[in-house]
């Protein structure tokens, strides 16, 4: 093995250890609920108890069926079922607001590039309606999509607003 001399102000007998003699040890980290080669179980499996009891018929014992439930943080309440809005945050309207900075060409280009399913005729109609009434509905989308459209239209310097769409049943 070849060792190199240290260039520091130490006695002449000190040498730097060769790179081969350095050993690295890998740390073994175990998960909280096991550490075997297989993955951990996240949810309880669906188990039919009647098959586990040797095939006995439990229907005459009036035992309610067991439903596998996961903890959703609601302390057992069914707040998800009580909601009247569809999943995804509900529908929102993307409104084009009237602004003296808007030009028809710029608004048409922005709307047709950002909002899918729009054409130049629809964009021109939105521009004319916003000039006449002060605002126009560009599209209706889920909240997350509507926020994305608003952010992208903002990059084109188009003033927009969002409002919940309560007209759909």
Swiss-Prot record:
It comes from the Eukaryota. InterPro entries: ClpS (IPR022935), Ribosomal_bL12_C/ClpS-like (IPR014719). Residues 67-92 are annotated as: Disordered. One of its GO terms (biological process) is proteolysis. Residues 1-33 form a transit peptide. Keywords: Chloroplast, Plastid, Transit peptide. The keyword Plastid applies. One of its GO terms (cellular component) is chloroplast stroma. The keyword Membrane does not apply. It is found in: Plastid, Chloroplast stroma. Small adapter protein that modulate the activity of plastid Clp protease system (CLPC). Probably involved in substrate selection for plastid CLPC. Belongs to the ClpS family. This is ATP-dependent Clp protease adapter protein CLPS2, chloroplastic. It comes from Chlamydomonas reinhardtii. The lineage of its organism: Eukaryota, Viridiplantae, Chlorophyta, core chlorophytes, Chlorophyceae.
